[in-house]
Amino acid sequence: MDNLDKYGEHNDDLDSMYSTYDRNNYGDYDNSYKRFDVNKKEVCLSYSSMQSYYECAFKYYLDNILRPDDSDVTFFNTIGTIAHNVLQEMVLDNTKDFDVLWDNQVTFTSAKESYFNKKIKEEIREDFNIILNQKELSYFDDVECEKRIKLKLRDNIFFKGFIDKILKCKDNLCIVDYKTGNTKIEDKYFEFGLNLQLPSYLYLLQEDPSKIIGFYLQHLVAPKYVYDEKKDIETQKNEDMKLSGFTSNDISRINILEDLDGKSSVVSKLAITKNGDLSKNSKVIADEDMKDMIKLVEDKILEASTSILNNDFSINPKVIDNKNVSCIYCRYKDICYKRLKDYVYYETKKEEAVDGD
């Protein structure tokens, strides 16, 4: 069969084989997922697992059902965890010794890891000083760190997550999630169940939107700087540490973050005009839109969970506005043997993106 398939050579034994096995589709391969009962009686999604499902249901199946052994913990995973832990401790009590907190968690042995550890440690120290300066501009009187939440939507459907930091002033709240990567929160993808990290925090808190000041990401490790003769490194660092996300359009709430006068020193894409109005380029959101966001998150949780309980793990990577948003960084892209017919195509009209992780 191999000689026939590769070189077109006909062997006399083929006729007797065909009479026994008939002419099958030798060399053909069906990559499609064959639905079967994976015995999943309940689903507990997080933002990341829901993101995985909406990127590609088969990816979720591999990550969360089969769970191939992948015990490798990268340097940047570890350094990210250390940064989160140290910032949590320092935000709660800034009299603690930064060096002791950091060094007690470090287990790096190679010269390369030790070098980058020192560099990142100093950058996180700078980050903390900027966070303190931002706090001095605000009227927050309380903070809660690493808040873990698990919600029950149905008897067999749950949603969980944790929020790095919740800043409080009386009944008003501000949500902050630290990031050490380079993510962009693209709200044009929300309707497809993607990039719902910030809206997920709103959903987890289950608070009235009228209490929300804003919900944001905050970069901890700076990207590569593009030279700008008008800005020194310190200025660029302060700009990179601005909160990125969505701010209430209620100026009275915004003024809890800082006494806003012109361009915000704390939040990116936020400014007030000389007339006292929010600038047209400000990234703000109304309470009703927050309610819609919360409703969308719940709908997407239920939609994904129902499909998972129905054993739907099709290979269905998404292409949005001609951009493949599922396969670029997928570690399974070489084993799913996806075909053109497997892609799911969407188009959006929005062009807005919010810088994040």
Q: Locations of the language-model features?
A:
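RecB-family 4Fe-4S metal-dependent nuclease core
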Residues: 1-357
